[in-house]
Amino acid sequence: TISAPLNLTGTTPRITSSMTFSDLTKTTTTADGIFFTAGTTQTIASGGSITLYGAASNLLSVSSSDSAVFTINFADATASYAIGYVSMSYVTASGQNILAINSTDGGNNGGITFASATSGTLRYWIATTSTTWNSTANWSTTSGGAGGSSVPTTTSDAIFDGNGNGACAIDAAASVKGLYLAGYTGTVTQNSGITV
C-alpha cells in the first residue's frame, strides 16, 4: 500500500505487482505511457484517486506490458478518477465504470466507456467563480474550453474535472445522463432537483 500521493514523472513507468494507492497520477504532454503487469490489480483506496491524462496530440498509452488484462479496482464509491486523452488496452475496471474522455479504445478493455467531446454528449463545467448550473456560459464542449454550450440534459454527461472550480448552485430542475466529479475542488449545491 502506498498511502502518500504518487506522481509518476519518469518516462514509461512500469508497475509490476498488485498495489493499493491513495492517489496515483501520470500526466504528460509528450508521447509516453504507463504499463502494468498482466494479472495484477491496482486498487484505488477509499477516498483516493487515479489521474491519467495525456494531450490531444499525444495520447498517454495505458496498457498491460504482457498483452493480457490487468485490473484497476476502486475500493468504493468515494474513490475517484480523472482519465482523458489516453489510449487504453488490456484494462478492466472494477468497483466503478470509467469514462475515458477524448480517448481511444485499443482493445481488450472492460468496464470502460470511451467518449469524445466532438460527439456533443459531454459538457464540462468551466466557471471559475460561484455561479449557477442553468447558465450556458458555464458549460463547454471541451475541458477548460470556451463557455456557451448548452446546459447538460438527459443525453449529456456533466463533467467537473477541475478546469473550472467555481462553486455550482443547481438552481433549476436538472436531468443528466451522468455526473462526474474528478479533480474538482469546488462545491455543488443542490437548490433544486437533479436526476442522474
List each model region and its residues.
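Extracellular beta-sheet-rich ligand-binding/adhesion modules
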Residues: 1-196
